[in-house]
């Protein structure tokens, strides 16, 4: 079996390995986990979803807006009851909230967006509850296909304390990693470098620090949230995601030839 844990230092992993062996009599090994990417948008768009196979009908118009970093997903209804009955509006809101919506760059989870119901249509005879689920999901996807999507990756906030002799090496490493950093004085001959950098490249840096400082350097890492990915094209190519082929998250609408 597999258990996923947040990335830890080598010493912590060794302690955990010993504890598991002592308590449960099990020998375990640790492998490098994968980075969890997310997606958002950087411009406002309107997405339209229409679902009208024979004897079914629903149409949903959604406004997709970028949110503040770390704000997560927010959903609202700003639709007149003259356009769409309140019960149908509540149903659309429920369908927005119930699903983990996926982006169109890599199929990763969406975050830091506001999605607002602004209009919709129902049929007095043919509309069923499931029709609005289909129309809602398709409206989200259709909007995303129009938007300027942004791939996000997790970042660490870091603090590195090293002897002055190793500052040049550390700064070169952080520049190579695409990290933003500042330097400040510490006690004696030591210097503290603080900043933020991608988890994907800085997560295993402790081993390098130990090697070039001969065990005297101290690196502290803390999660700092998600930031725009530093190597977007490379990650997108690796995922090879094609939104038009994702049958679980369709991007198109469904119309009935000749009407319902």
Task: Please provide the spans of the model-predicted regions.
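Accessory interaction regions appended to the cores of large information-processing enzymes
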Residues: 1-260
